[in-house]
Curated annotation (Swiss-Prot):
Alphabetically ordered keywords of this record: Endoplasmic reticulum, Glycoprotein, Membrane, Transmembrane, Transmembrane helix
Tissue expression notes: Expressed in the ovary, followed by the intestine and brain.
Family membership: Belongs to the TMEM39 family.
Residues modified by glycosylation: 9, 20, 29, 45
Name under which the protein is recorded: Transmembrane protein 39B
Principal location listed in the UniProt entry: endoplasmic reticulum
Annotated knockout phenotype: Homozygous knockout fish for tmem39b are viable and fertile and seem normal. However, adult males have a significantly lower standard length and body weigh.
InterPro entries reported for this sequence: Uncharacterised_TMEM39
Gene name in the database record: tmem39b
């Protein structure tokens, strides 16, 4: 009955005892107790009594013991850009083979039969322009490496200055010469086709082009969503050319230089934890934008530009061009993500997600007889506790939780990075699926040019797949060893 005694067999919503739950985000020398006030007791019919229940039991903040991962070798910036440029050259070469192939095995009485490609139909100025665009990252990496400061010997300094001058002069002269010829040969409408991909820079980068300072700004120095929104609104009134100039300057300085690795602060303040997560979230989004824009730009110039400027008398396999666009974009994305999201960076995101925690929305009717607290942003909430926020009930899912229950971005951050190997597993699945598709297409191909194309592209992906598998095996053993060691200590 309504006012009777609750039955002994009545099941309640899963909730850990508050006196046993502990959590931390700090170093080992910190401890704190955080009572939570304003708690309401709920009756069976869901009506509040209006009385404050006793505060949560005193909690000792025990530091999270993060796993120490080994240092994995990463390619230097120039070597990485050289490998990426080689993959793009291979894809561009096989595309030209598919466009300008000949029937060279025919007898001399049948035209044409002397070369495997119709070299006289190739526009070499367009080819030079495409190669320079694909080599933009490599050129910038070489120039940055040659511009390094420090105590260098005089012959070494002379060599670096000479190399930088030679690379810039050769690239600039070739680019200007090819552009002059293209302006004389093609219409303005056709040349606009070359500039179309650069229009992605503004919508992708202008809203976050100056939130990072190259190593000079701490992630905990007051970065928040309000500050970011104010900065975006301040930039909104600028004219298009100034935004374009600022975007290009920031993009080149960040994209072509060594990516500064953010730092992780094991702090006890929930507000500082949320600010650190906000900074890391913006940094991760910036890197993903770089991956997306660079991969789409490279795939566009490899797959579509040669087709657009081909002569009308030449047959073009449009299906193969679209397939090549997908292969190049996915391959470039995986290679860039492995370079911009190294294991140390993914481990950093995992630590921040472990400190942030997560909330899961629950049905209020299932927990009407369970103690529910009013969520406040000043406290760390233990696992299993129920809170009320924005007229909804949430259950704490993390070891302890400082995330905002209604913030979807916090939930996404925890979902992607609470497992340290999730990003690496996604990359392995993408690369493995692409290699499997290429092997299947290679077995089904009947034309000689498609066989050569698929084989060359396939070999260019093996190196990236090997590096991903190596990182997965090493990191998997490191994290599993740390988890087993923690379980043994608990038992």
């Amino acid at each position: 009955m309504a006012g009777g005694r609750r039955g002994a067999n009545r099941t309640t919503y899963c909730r850990s005892p508050l006196s046993n739950d502990t959590g931390s985000v700090g170093n080992g020398n910190h401890s704190t107790s955080s009572p939570v006030t304003g708690v309401r007791s709920r009756t069976r019919n869901g009506s509040g009594t209006g009385m404050s229940s006793p505060p949560l039991a005193t909690q000792t903040v025990v530091p999270l013991k993060h796993c120490k991962i080994p240092e994995l070798s990463m390619d230097k910036n120039v070597l990485f850009e050289l490998h990426l440029f080689a993959c793009h050259l291979i894809a561009l070469f096989v595309h030209y083979v598919n466009i300008y192939k000949t029937v060279w095995w025919y007898p001399p009485s049948h035209p044409p039969s002397h070369t495997s490609l119709n070299f006289h139909l190739i526009d070499y100025n367009m080819l030079v322009f495409t190669v320079i665009v694909l080599a933009r990252r490599l050129i910038a990496a070489i120039v940055k490496e040659a511009s390094q400061s420090g105590k260098l010997s005089f012959p070494h300094s002379v060599f670096l200055v000479t190399a930088r001058f030679a690379v810039l002069t050769l690239a600039g002269w070739s680019l200007c010469r090819s552009l002059i010829y293209l302006f004389k040969t093609y219409s303005v409408l056709s040349l606009l086709f070359l500039c179309y991909p650069f229009g992605m820079y503004i919508p992708f980068f202008r809203l976050s082009c100056d939130f990072r300072r190259a190593g000079s700004m701490s992630p905990l120095s007051g970065i928040g969503s309000k500050d970011v929104g104010a900065a975006a609104l301040g930039r909104g009134g600028r004219d298009y050319l100034s935004v374009l100039k600022e975007t290009w300057k920031q993009h080149t300085s960040q994209l072509y230089s060594a990516q500064p690795m953010p730092t992780h602060a094991c702090c006890l303040s929930p507000d500082l934890i949320r600010k650190e997560v906000e900074y890391l979230k913006m940094d991760f989004n910036w890197r993903m934008k770089e991956v997306l824009v660079s991969s789409m730009l490279s795939a566009y110039y490899v797959a579509f530009v040669p087709v657009w400027f081909v002569k009308s008398t030449q047959y073009v396999d449009k299906r193969w061009s679209c397939e090549l666009f997908i292969l190049v974009s996915v391959s470039t994305s995986v290679i860039l993500m492995r370079h911009l999201l190294p294991p140390r960076y993914c481990d950093l995101l995992h630590k921040a997600a472990a400190h942030l925690g997560c909330w899961q929305k629950v049905d209020p009717s299932l927990c009407s007889n369970v103690l529910q607290h009013i969520w406040t942003e000043e406290y760390m909430w233990p696992q299993g506790v129920l809170v009320k926020h924005s007229k909804n009930v949430y259950k704490a899912m993390g070891h302890y939780n400082v995330a905002v229950p209604s913030d979807v971005s916090h939930y996404r951050f925890y979902f992607f990075f609470n497992k340290p190997l999730r990003i690496l597993n996604i990359l392995i699945i993408l690369e493995g699926a692409m290699i499997f598709y290429q092997l299947y297409s290679l077995m089904c191909s009947e034309k000689w040019h498609q066989t050569i194309s698929l084989a060359l592209i396939l070999f260019s992906n093996y190196y990236a797949f090997f590096k991903l598998l190596r990182d997965r095996i090493v990191l998997g053993k490191a994290y599993s060893y740390s988890a087993s060691a923690s379980n043994q200590k608990v038992s």
